[in-house]
């Protein structure tokens, strides 16, 4: 398969909603010693009329109710249930966690998974955080923005998870899929499979761990990828020179440039006035379509009589130039 291209954008959002509300993540300021903190809510289902592909996913074995089994090589992860019941399996031991249990930890290297427990009512809300290893690739906001963005798009719109893309993203967040339990040294095998296939081979084939469409702090993501010789070629840095919209407007000329005999093709030559409504966007936000006209014409077209005169003047100029 070709390297993945996102289907939606969620960068810059403190709260991201995936799978039609089945999963909601709220990014928060982390406490000292932790590299991220978010509050996350899983629902058992989404009621009411929803798109067919979402209903099919909810009714399938692949319904998002928690991440697959994984381990973190360098970080300890922390969980604190706010409401509902969290199911968590750590190194084969299954536990049922409620708000009364307070904060629990999963040590680095422990194979674990967590999920909304069947005993939980309609939803389950939990606070998650992790220790700060100081590594380029670790559990942090960038990783979770990209993992949840990809998970959503892959299951709903892309026909499922691409194994190389999955490993590339997981490797970008110190999250590694262990080998089956019967494989000796399953953690080591899982770790090096993610690194070799996800980072090294995937990087050479064009697979990125992070995407601009999902990532709020893109400068940080670029710095992470530049740290790997296998991913450095995937990084584009011209975005750093892009000016803000305000700066772009300051560069706009006060008058339209003239183009000599090529001018007519840069003007509105239609004899019919172009009637436009008031702008529907303000500061990038959609304000809704309006019925009334802004001012009769849009300023780039003229009335019929004026247009006839304009066309006549252009015709005379062309004729004079050809004589």
From Swiss-Prot:
Biased composition, class Basic and acidic residues, residue ranges: 305-316
Subcellular location: Vacuole lumen; Cytoplasmic vesicle lumen
Biotechnology: Patulin was originally used as an antibiotic and specifically trialed to be used against the common cold, but it is no longer used for that purpose since it has been shown to induce immunological, neurological and gastrointestinal effects. Genotoxic effects of patulin with dose-dependent increase in DNA strand breaks in brain, liver and kidneys have been detected in mice. However, more recently, it has been proposed that patulin might also have anti-tumor properties.
Enzyme Commission code: 1.-.-.-
Keywords, comma-separated and alphabetical: Cytoplasmic vesicle, Oxidoreductase, Vacuole
Main localization, broad class: other
GO cellular component entries: cytoplasmic vesicle lumen; vacuolar lumen; vacuole
Signal sequence annotation: none
Region Disordered, residue ranges: 291-323
Keyword Translocase: no
Top-rank taxon: Eukaryota
Protein task: Probable oxidoreductase; part of the gene cluster that mediates the biosynthesis of patulin, an acetate-derived tetraketide mycotoxin produced by several fungal species that shows antimicrobial properties against several bacteria. PatJ acts with patO in the vacuole to convert gentisyl alcohol to isoepoxydon. The pathway begins with the synthesis of 6-methylsalicylic acid by the polyketide synthase (PKS) patK via condensation of acetate and malonate units.
Protein name according to UniProt: Probable oxidoreductase patJ
Organism of provenance: Aspergillus clavatus (strain ATCC 1007 / CBS 513.65 / DSM 816 / NCTC 3887 / NRRL 1 / QM 1276 / 107)
Taxonomic classification: Eukaryota, Fungi, Dikarya, Ascomycota, Pezizomycotina
Gene: patJ
């Amino acid at each position: 398969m070709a390297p993945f291209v996102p289907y939606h954008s969620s960068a810059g959002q403190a709260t991201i909603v995936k799978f039609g509300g089945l999963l909601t993540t709220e990014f928060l300021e982390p406490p000292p010693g932790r590299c991220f903190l978010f509050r996350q809510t899983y629902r058992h289902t989404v009621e009411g009329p929803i798109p067919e592909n979402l209903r099919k996913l909810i009714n399938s074995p692949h319904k998002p109710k928690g991440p697959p089994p994984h381990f973190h090589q360098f970080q300890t992860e922390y969980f604190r249930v706010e409401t509902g019941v969290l199911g968590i399996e750590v190194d084969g031991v299954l536990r049922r966690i409620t708000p009364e249990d307070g904060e629990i930890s999963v040590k680095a290297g422990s194979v674990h998974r967590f999920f909304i427990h069947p005993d939980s009512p309609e939803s389950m809300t939990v606070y998650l955080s992790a220790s700060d290893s100081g590594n380029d690739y670790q559990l942090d906001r960038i990783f979770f923005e990209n993992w949840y963005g990809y998970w959503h798009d892959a299951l709903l719109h892309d026909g499922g998870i691409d194994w190389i893309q999955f490993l590339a993203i997981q490797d970008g967040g110190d999250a590694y899929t262990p080998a089956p339990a019967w494989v000796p040294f399953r953690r080591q095998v899982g770790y090096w499979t993610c690194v070799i296939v996800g980072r090294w081979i995937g990087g050479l084939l064009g697979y990125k761990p992070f995407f601009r469409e999902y990532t709020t702090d893109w400068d940080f993501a670029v710095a992470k990828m530049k740290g790997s010789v296998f991913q450095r070629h995937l990084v584009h840095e011209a975005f750093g020179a892009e000016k803000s919209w305000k700066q772009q407007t300051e560069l706009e000329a006060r008058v339209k440039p003239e183009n000599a005999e090529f001018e007519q093709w840069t003007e509105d030559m239609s004899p019919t006035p172009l009637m436009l409504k008031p702008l529907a966007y303000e500061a990038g936000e959609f304000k809704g379509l309006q019925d009334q006209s802004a001012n009769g014409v849009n300023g780039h077209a003229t009335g019929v009589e004026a247009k006839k005169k304009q066309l006549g003047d252009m015709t005379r100029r062309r004729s004079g130039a050809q004589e």
